[in-house]
Design a protein with these regions (language model features):
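Thioredoxin-like thiol-disulfide oxidoreductase module
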Residues: 3-64, 69-70
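Alpha-helical segment of the N-proximal tetratricopeptide repeat
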Residues: 33, 66-100, 116, 134
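Short solvent-exposed coil/turn linkers within tandem alpha-helical repeat scaffolds
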Residues: 51, 55-61, 93-103, 118, ...
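Specific register positions within alpha-helical solenoid repeats of the TPR/Sel1-like families, i.e.
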Residues: 78, 111-115, 149-150
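Single-residue signature of alpha-solenoid repeat helices
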Residues: 86, 123-124
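Alpha-helical solenoid repeat scaffolds, predominantly canonical TPR units
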Residues: 89, 126-127
C-alpha cells in the first residue's frame, strides 16, 4: 500500500484531516500482540481511548481505502452513539463511493443509526429495501433479512 495507496493525494487529505496514523510492523511487540496483528497490511481504526471500531486486512486501492477509512470513522461515532456525526459520514460513502465494498455496510449502519436516534422502525425496513435493490448479493443484505418481519 506504500507504493500505491498511501501516496494518493485524496488518501493523504483524509488521513491528515481526520486521523493520526501510526505504522506498526506485524511482528513488532507488544503492539502486534495487543491489537492481534497477524498479517500486513492491517489497518485498524481506533478511537482516542484505543478502542477498536473497524479493521481491514490486505491491500486496498485508494478507491476502496478511502471509503473504508470513512466507515471506520463513522463506526467510531456510531459505537459511542454519536449518530449525528456518524450519519453524514455514512451518507458521504453512499454518495461518493456507492460501488465500494464499504457501501453495503454503510447502508446498514446508517439505517441502524437512524433507527436508534428516532426509534422509527421504517428506517430498518429501508435498510433491507435499499440493500436488496443496490447490493443484492452482499452479506449485509442477508443480515438485514429479519427487518422484513417488521
Amino acid at each position: 500500500m506504500g507504493a500505491v495507496t498511501y501516496p494518493d493525494e485524496k488518501v493523504i487529505e483524509i488521513i491528515e484531516k481526520y486521523m493520526v496514523p501510526i505504522q506498526v510492523l506485524f511482528d513488532s511487540q507488544p503492539l502486534a500482540a495487543r491489537f492481534n496483528i497477524q498479517w500486513t497490511p492491517t489497518v485498524i481504526t481506533l478511537d482516542e481511548e484505543g478502542k477498536e471500531h473497524h479493521r481491514t486486512i490486505g491491500f486496498l486501492a485508494p478507491e476502496e481505502f478511502i471509503p473504508s477509512l470513512m466507515l471506520g470513522m463513522a463506526k467510531c461515532h456510531f459505537d459511542r452513539e454519536k449518530f449525528s456525526k456518524a450519519i453524514p459520514m455514512l451518507e458521504d460513502i453512499l454518495k461518493n463511493h456507492p460501488k465500494s465494498e464499504a457501501a453495503p455496510e454503510a447502508v446498514y449502519v446508517r439505517g441502524v443509526a437512524l433507527y436508534k436516534s428516532t426509534h422509527k422502525a421504517d428506517f430498518l425496513k429501508e435498510i433491507l429495501k435499499r440493500l436488496q435493490a443496490e447490493y443484492p448479493s452482499s452479506e449485509w443484505t442477508k443480515r438485514a433479512k429479519p427487518y422484513s418481519l417488521l
